[in-house]
Amino acid sequence: MFVQAPPTPNYKWFSCISSTVFTALCLLPIFSAAGYAQTPQNRVIKIGVVQRFGTKATDKLTLKAIPGDSLTLSYKTPQGTETKTVASIKLEIANKPLEAPLVEERVVLSSHRSFESAEDSANQWRAKGIDVEIAQPLRWQVWAKRDTYNSPLVRRWLLQSLQAQGNKTAFLDTKVFKQIPQTFWVLNGFRFNRNELDVTAGKNVIEVLEQTTQEATAIEPEKAIQETRRYGGSLRLQKNAYGTYTLVNEVPTETYLRGVVPHEIGAFSPYASIVAQTILARTYALRNLRRFAVDNYELCADVNCQVYKGLAEVYPQSDRAIAQTSGLVLTYENQLVDALYSASSGGVTARFGDVWHGPERPYLRSIVDSPNNVWDLSKQSLSDENNFRRFMTLKKGFNEEKEETFRWREEVSLTSIGGFLKQYLQKKKHPLANFKTVTQVEVVERSPAGRVLQMKVQTDLGPIDIDKDEIRNAFYPPISTLFYLEPIYNADKTLNGYAFVGGGFGHGVGMSQTGSYNLANLGWNGSRILGFYFPGAQVVPLGDAITFWRE
């Protein structure tokens, strides 16, 4: 199935780059007090800015108008839709006792670190005739579609059928609730209990104060968090697939980019890098609108999508890049590219298939991240362990050579490896999750670009294989999959642990953000930078002939 852009109106597209007058016009705010109009080039997108409101009974959200403005609340009553005008509103949570326990149950077919691999898994299940949906309760998961498998009998029949065919990863996730979170607010002495609320502002800017509690981790205790953001567009509070609430920001794409670009690439980065990042961020957003269909919104506001901080911190350089590239996207054969980027590549970018499961993208190739001829991958494949280790000794001639994460080393004991791996396997409900000891870890296979494709862990219960980007979830040290292992021995020559010796930060597919800095400083413009990291792709104005993605 092809998902295409809406029809393009008949108008002249122009660049804001050269004309002083046009530049001044383009740098005006992207929203105004008069409101905003959705166009094919500036469609309104739905961002889950607070994804799990109500997880804690102490969660609070305060929505405020900016000075000189007011908020309009819209909500359902038995008599129809009612509206109220206020300066601010405080949303709180009360745990509502249930007359009878509520059982929520789903068949989880697979669990993944990333949406990309989850989507490939979903497509494989669909090819087998199983109706599925993608969700993200914590990790990304593929569920048997709840509307289709809507009874305990049908769900158990499906699970038993899969197990009879040898499937060991699918499981039944069952939760029993004696109470559920209910959002409420108090207005003029009356308490309103509602599951949906729409909030607009005359000037299309709403301030959000979020108060919540961050759960304790292995290295940090539980702590209270208070954060204030400003969002353009409107807000909607709605139920999600997990029994809590999501605050959704409905915002024009170009306004959304103001809260993304400076926080992804850095507000004071070289300007050509900011331009390249802007085109990628726009392309990424439009290509990934399907990510949260299960929750009835489109994108999140963190690193599982793109970091989005609203309008509280916007900067002239990124605003200028957004205005000057208005409507420009990166395409390959009239389809939006998978506009991937990471902090640093470690000197060589990865193919899509080096990191995730799914079809290769022809424009996402393994490229030595250097303007110079420092290594020839066609003659010295990094799948060869000796070549790879020699490559990792190189420190000069690369775009990222001055970056701290270009090369790194982290030592970890077998005990720590085992503890971290056990947590990972328990979340996946892996059959060997209750192992007691790890005796050996090894790299089994790596790609021609040097990325680790598979690792094997020997435990007292048997071997466990970890592949591709799951490696970064299963082990604590590696911040990329571009690494090798060095054993560390005790004084008595028994194995104590391993040093992970590697390079880069992130998945390494597509554009290296720090690599783009060097290319920009060499005088490359944004389009040339994108051409380097996405060979064969083209920067074009968004139009109705462009396919957003293929399902």
Residue ranges and their predicted role:
Residues 2-6, 10-551:
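Conserved, single-site charged/polar hotspot
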